[in-house]
């Protein structure tokens, strides 16, 4: 027996060593795997003003064409995608433990409270809630008088589980509180169907609406909805506004406005009062506005003849329209009041808020007695409250250096208060109720992270970097207070710089996995974004687009020169068309970046803009028109795919979705192929294409796993 007691541990030890050796051998083999061999074909883009050689054009195929799995070119592209995915998976093999560790951190930190929302509509209070296991919301409601008796009335998780891809567009309760209308995309094509759920009968009515853009508006009768449907006609994308009636006598679908001869896109909204529907055609920086008076059951009425570059946004209060407009070169917008009966006489409009050079009117919320304006001063939100009865106004302001505040869930036209969400880079999101008369600020909901989090451990600040032309570029920062600002910390930088968008300066639980590892996290607010208003946007558009790239470069240099972090540890992240800015920077100054992570990046800009089947007017307005010679060559001078040279490229990881409708999967694949061809470094250049398996960004489990992959990749580069 004694001999066996000795032998068994020896056998087990030998077995463990064998398993470990086998695991190490597998890991070694995977790390030594070479990148896929990529075929090259001579293809010449015969553009109007020049020719371009493109050896990887064979990868370019529309996602809809990829559905024909029998076509030889489709098989070829799929084989390449699978080879790239296998190569990426091999390189991530050694990062499995780190990825799992990060996923656990995200889940332990994540609080679903921040995702939840609630609002009162008539006699009911509604709750949209998530659980730690759910990807989609559950809808509850209670009597507005007795909030303790909540009843589950709809669960999107029971619907989403039946689809590989499920993205909710819009969810709206009917005015009579009897129906839920929702839109959803189950293919990733951004074509949404609409269903109507009868709460009392527990019955879903599927409509004939299969290809709308996701927007829904209820009519005041609770028996009709308004939506927008897009089609293609001779290669041109067109959109139309429809009304869909589901009456006892049958169903009727009626086209209200047709844009067959116009470009742009539609948005629709219902006034808080319930009387009007406002319809906006956004085209070439111009907004053409229509309204429907539901009391009179009228057809759409044109508010004003379109004027190039002029926008009219409407609200309703009693017998007046409230008008937000940038007419007469008011880039930051003014606010007017007009009698509904005399709206065409702009000379009779009453000025409520004049134009101010340093204040941007972002949004307005109209109540029976008050108007709340969401304004921006130096990039930070403030709420301007106007008393419509006495004409007096006051502000609700905030004290942090950098934060995010926005109006939310204000559905009651007769309310004596408004609600808003407040968050910052270090402050979890909270919902406040602000009383108009007393000016009291009441906390009604706060998201609490599930870990031992103390916001006092972190420092947030806003600094101003000087760009190449002397322009001051705002940069928002967060880091742990115990991090020494001695030029040694790793820097993780994000940014906005396109389409006038602004990156919300809110609490992101996953960011704290980097902060706890000593990162300084930065968000640069570049020209081309909307942080400082419309003028800031226009300063980084079209023939000024390179300014966005220069702003990013100089923001990074400012951080390094002021010892916020190390020049050898700069990491960058960007998504979609906005990633073009970082892609151009990587081309121009690869030595500045240690590692980059991208999601669906728009790197082949020139080819995309010249593709008439998929381009839309907004992209032309933002980047320029390649059919104009000066703009063509300007775009060609910085478009990332056209400007890859022999260089020491950093490590790069790209995630893309096969069904991405805005920036195409082939933009990532082509760019990676060309970079590998030109790079002089041995750094990893990885691309992984999601083949539509639970790809929706609303699937929180998948979204966190993807983020964990990205961060594992970056953190591994510090070793």
What does each of the following model-derived ranges do?
Residues 7, 16-417, 423-429, 433-434, ...:
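Beta-propeller folds
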Residues 174, 188-191, 219, 268-271, ...:
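Conserved structured core elements
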Residues 526-719:
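Active-site-proximal cap/loop segments of hydrolase catalytic domains
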Residues 157-171, 183-188, 203, 436-440, ...:
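Cap/lid segment of the alpha/beta-hydrolase catalytic domain
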Residues 130, 326, 423, 494-500, ...:
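Glycine-rich His-Gly loop
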Residues 126, 226, 493, 522, ...:
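Hydrophobic/aromatic beta-strand patches that form the interior of the parallel beta-sheet core
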Residues 4-12:
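Sec-dependent N-terminal signal peptides
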Residues 288, 313, 332-334, 344-349, ...:
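Extended hydrophobic-aromatic, low-complexity segments
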């Amino acid at each position: 027996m004694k001999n066996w007691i000795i032998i068994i541990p020896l056998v087990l030890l030998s077995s463990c060593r064998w398993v470990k050796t086998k695991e190490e051998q597998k890991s070694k083999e995977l790390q030594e795997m070479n990148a896929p061999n990529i075929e090259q074909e001579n293809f010449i883009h015969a553009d109007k003003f020049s020719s371009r050689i493109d050896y990887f054009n064979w990868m370019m195929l529309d996602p809809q064409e990829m559905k024909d799995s029998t076509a030889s070119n489709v098989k070829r592209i799929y084989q390449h995608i699978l080879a790239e995915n296998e190569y990426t998976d091999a390189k991530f093999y050694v990062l499995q433990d780190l990825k799992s560790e990060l996923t656990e951190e995200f889940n332990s930190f994540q609080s679903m409270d921040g995702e939840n929302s609630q609002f009162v509509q008539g006699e009911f209070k509604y709750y949209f809630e998530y659980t730690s296991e759910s990807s989609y919301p559950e809808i509850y409601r209670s009597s507005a008088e007795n909030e303790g008796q909540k009843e589950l009335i709809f669960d999107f998780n029971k619907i989403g589980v039946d689809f590989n891809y499920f993205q909710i567009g819009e969810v709206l309760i009917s005015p009579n509180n009897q129906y839920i209308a929702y839109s959803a995309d189950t293919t990733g094509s951004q074509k949404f169907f609409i269903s109507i759920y009868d709460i009392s009968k527990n019955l879903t009515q599927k409509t004939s609406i299969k290809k709308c853009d996701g927007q829904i508006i209820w009519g005041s009768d609770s028996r009709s909805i308004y939506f927008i449907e897009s089609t293609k006609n001779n290669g041109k994308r067109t959109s139309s506004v429809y009304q869909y009636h589901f009456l006892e006598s049958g169903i009727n679908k009626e086209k209200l406005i047709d844009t067959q001869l116009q470009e742009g896109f539609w948005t629709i909204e219902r006034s808080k009062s319930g009387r009007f529907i406002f319809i906006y055609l956004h085209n070439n920086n111009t907004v053409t506005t229509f309204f429907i008076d539901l009391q009179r059951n009228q057809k759409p009425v044109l508010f004003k003849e379109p004027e190039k570059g002029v926008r009219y946004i409407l609200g309703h209060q009693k017998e007046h329209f409230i008008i937000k407009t940038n007419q007469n070169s008011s880039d930051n917008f003014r606010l007017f009041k007009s009698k509904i009966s005399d709206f065409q006489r702009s000379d009779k409009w009453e000025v409520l808020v004049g134009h101010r050079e340093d204040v941007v009117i972002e949004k307005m919320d109209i109540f029976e007695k008050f108007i709340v304006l969401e304004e921006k001063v130096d990039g930070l939100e403030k709420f301007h409250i106007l008393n419509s009865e006495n004409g007096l106004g006051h502000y609700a302001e905030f004290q942090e250096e950098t934060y995010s505040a926005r109006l939310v869930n204000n559905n009651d036209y007769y309310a004596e208060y408004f609600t808003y969400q407040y968050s910052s880079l270090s402050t979890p999101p909270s919902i406040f109720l602000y009383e108009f008369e007393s000016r009291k600020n009441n906390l009604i909901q706060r998201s609490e992270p599930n870990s031992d989090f103390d916001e006092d451990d972190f420092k947030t600040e806003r600094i101003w970097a000087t760009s190449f032309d002397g322009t001051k570029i705002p940069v928002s920062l967060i880091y742990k207070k115990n991090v020494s600002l001695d030029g040694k910390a790793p820097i993780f930088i994000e940014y906005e710089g396109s389409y006038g968008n602004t990156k919300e300066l809110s609490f992101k639980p996953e960011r704290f996995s980097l902060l706890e590892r000593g990162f300084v996290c930065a968000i640069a607010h570049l020209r081309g974004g909307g942080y400082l208003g419309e003028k800031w946007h226009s300063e980084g558009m079209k023939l000024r687009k390179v300014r966005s790239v220069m702003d990013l470069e100089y923001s990074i240099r400012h951080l390094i020169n002021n010892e916020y972090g190390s020049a050898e540890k700069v990491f960058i992240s960007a998504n979609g068309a906005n990633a073009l800015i970082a892609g151009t920077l990587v081309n121009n100054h690869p030595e500045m970046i240690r590692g980059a992570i991208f999601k669906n990046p728009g790197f082949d800009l020139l080819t995309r803009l010249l593709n008439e089947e998929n381009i839309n007017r907004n992209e032309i307005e933002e980047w320029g028109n390649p059919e104009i010679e000066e703009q063509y060559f300007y775009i060609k001078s910085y478009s990332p795919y056209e400007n890859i040279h022999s260089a020491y490229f950093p490590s790069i990881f790209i995630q893309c979705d096969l069904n991405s409708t805005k920036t195409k999967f082939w933009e990532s694949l082509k760019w990676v192929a060309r970079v590998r061809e030109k790079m002089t470094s041995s750094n990893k250049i990885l691309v992984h294409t999601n083949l539509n398996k639970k790809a929706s960004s609303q699937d929180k489990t998948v979204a966190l796993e993807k983020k964990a992959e990205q961060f594992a990749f970056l953190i591994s580069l510090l070793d």
